[in-house]
Amino acid sequence: MTQLQTEILVKGQPAKAEALVLTAPISFWGGVNPKTGLIADVRHPQHGVAITGKVLCLPGTIGSSSAAAVLLELVYAGLAPAAIILHEPDAILLLGLIVAQEMDHGTPMALKLDREAFGCLSHKILQIDAGGMISIR
C-alpha cells in the first residue's frame, strides 16, 4: 500500500472511493450537470462520466465565477465527489465547499497534490483520512 501526504485546502469528510483522474481541465459551469453529477461538456474527453462519489482529480479548471454554485448544488443534492484533489488551489471552486460547510452540509475534502502524482491514482481506490493522508489500494 502506498501513502501520499497532501495539503488540505478545505477540511471535509474523510473518504474512501475510486479515483477519477480527468485528462483535461473542466469548467463546472456548463461542464458538470448539477442535477445528475455527470460531465456534461460534450467536448471533454470524459463526457458522460459520473463524478458523484469519486475522488475527483482535476488537472485544472476552466474559470467561471459560477463554479462555486454548481459545486454547492452537487453537495446539496448528494451528487458531489467524495473528495477533490487539485494540483493548485482554485478559490472560486473551493468557495462552493466553504459555503456548503457554513450551511451545515457534509462536504467533501479538497486537497492539493502535485499533478505528477495523479497518474498513479487513476482507477485506484483511495482512502483519505482527516489529516489529508491518502492510502492507495
Q: Predicted regions span which residues?
A:
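Intrinsically disordered, low-complexity regions enriched in acidic/Ser/Thr/Pro/Gln residues
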Residues: T2-L9, P14
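Phosphate/diphosphate-binding glycine-rich loops and adjacent basic-rich segments that engage nucleotide
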Residues: G131-R137
